[in-house]
Amino acid sequence: IGCSNETTWGLTKSIAVAEREGVARYETIQNNFSLNNRRFEDELAQACRQEGVSLIPYSPLGGGVLSGKYNGGATPDGARFSNYLKLGGRQAVMARRFVNERSLASTERFGAIAGEAGMSLVTLATAWSKQHDFVASTIVGATHEDQLPEIFAAADVTLGKDVLDAINKVSQEIRYPMG
């Protein structure tokens, strides 16, 4: 049994109630977690470690932003957030959460790290997502079959300390790029 988009309080409270009532408890949590959205690490990661709950992160590519396709202000035809920006309203608000000056700046820096490490940004972002002790598996998505090789390449990648340190430096300098 799992939950999605839950808070630390909600997760720990539900576990306490399940234990009190003698019913099945949450074993997994599915939340957004990527190089551009590391809020899970603020509190939920520690709660998951203490309670034995595994994260199954979704959107490890930040809605496609971490593919680099929006770099330089590009709005690729047919891309989800390009379409959302055209629609306006609520969709545009969501798009701006993912595609903004800070997320694009961090994405470009992560891309440079990936290049120095000899891999694509997609592979770096996916490998980073799976390389946490609280992660059970990562939910990946692709709109085209040709996107899969870079994603699958991450299965065989373990990021070294120097790469992780470089990633963490970017995350410290550009805090919470998705707000």
Task: Please name every model-derived segment.
Residues 2-169, 174, 178:
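Beta/alpha (TIM)-barrel catalytic core signal, keyed to glycine-rich beta->alpha loops juxtaposed to Asp/Glu
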